[in-house]
Amino acid sequence: MSQHRNATHRLSFVFTVVSLALLPFTATSMCRAAAGPAGTPPDAPKAPPDVIIFTNGDQLSGTFIHEVGGTVTFHSDIVGDINIEWDKIKELRTQTKVAVLNKSISPEKKKLPPNIPQGTVTVADDKVNVHPENNAPVETVPVKDAQYIIDQNTFNKEVLGRPGIFQAWAGSATAGATIVQATQKQYTFNGAVALARVVPTVSWLNPKERTTIDFSGSYGKISQHAYISGGEFFPPTSIKSAIYHADAEHDWYFTPRVYFLVQTAFDHNFSQGLDLQQIYGGGIGWTALKSPVQELDLKGTIQYEKQSFINATDDVNQNLIGSTFAAMYMRKLPKGMIFNQEVSYIPAYNNLHAYSVSESNSLAMPFYKSLSLSIGTLDSYLNNPAPALPPTQRNSFQFTFGATYVIKSKY
């Protein structure tokens, strides 16, 4: 019993000594764990929020986005993005550094004055006070003269900078398919890509240039195997459909709503016997309607047009001088849905019978992040199809359904 007690006391003594020896290392490890991984600086304190005080005394904290034409856009985690008129604001204080452009400064001009006020701002008593860095003197701009108040990052990119040719592209890509395996085998594939590059990329600045590239296509085939019925042999049959369209356009704005344009377009429609229609032209466009929820563009061009038909002789193929008169309409609907419509009339002046008309519609319905369901129609009329057996129908109608991926600009 005595030996057992002595052994127990010795073990307790050894354990105590080891614990005391490891205590400094344990404390150091705990301090390091509390301080975070080695070499990792502590989190920087968040910048104080921007603050709006309304004329009724209410206060809202968040992030100042911009002011355009007397309307302030402000983001709050509670209410999201809101637009506020100056007459509803008693005071505005920003920690966000901004640039203030008065009415005498046009962002569309390539050369801007070197002394544009930049810094944090306070707005009170109908005055915008700009506080530059390095304790420079405060600059004051009357509220009524502050046409744009833009954060410095946006100012540097959209006003002073210019995206590269492969930057600032946005648009959508759509794909759909139908496959049937039965007595007849049927498959149809359709797809479309629509890209646009607008400079500047923000909608609240007047555009300087716009480039669009579009492609749409549909290919289908119905086939049936050979068979024997009543002692008679029936050979295999197949029916093909193919419709393709591609176009590109570049616009130069000389007013906020009117622009010069050059364009090219290519069309193929197997059902109408059209092997290839080529268009090269230029003209003028007008944005007749523009608002946050809808836009309408009207265009007219003078162009060269060449039509080549399938299995046609040279006297059937056409070299034409004509025009394209087109209208494009976009409407933003509730729940993030977007409706697009385009109508075009293409007359020929050296052959009045060689005209065509087309009309397309599309509706995109978002369902998950950048993905949408899309429904579309394409109706085209070609007045001068090539002679064929059976006779070619002048009208072609197409209905499509698919999934659309929205491509967002990273600029």
What are these model-predicted stretches?
Residues 202-211, 257-260, 291-296, 330-339, ...:
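Repeated loop/turn-to-beta-strand initiation elements of outer-membrane beta-barrel proteins
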Residues 166-247, 251, 263-271:
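Transmembrane beta-barrel domains of bacterial outer-membrane proteins
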Residues 293-369:
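Outer-membrane beta-barrel transmembrane domain signature
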Residues 173-177, 191-197, 248-252, 266, ...:
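Residues on the lipid-exposed face of transmembrane beta-strands in outer-membrane beta-barrel proteins
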Residues 31-180, 185-186, 192-194:
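Compositionally biased alpha-helical segments
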Residues 395-411:
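Outer-membrane beta-barrel "beta-signal"
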Residues 171-173, 189, 209-215, 260-262, ...:
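Transmembrane beta-strands of outer-membrane beta-barrel proteins
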Residues 185-191, 240-244, 276-280, 294, ...:
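Residues that define the transmembrane beta-barrel architecture of outer-membrane proteins
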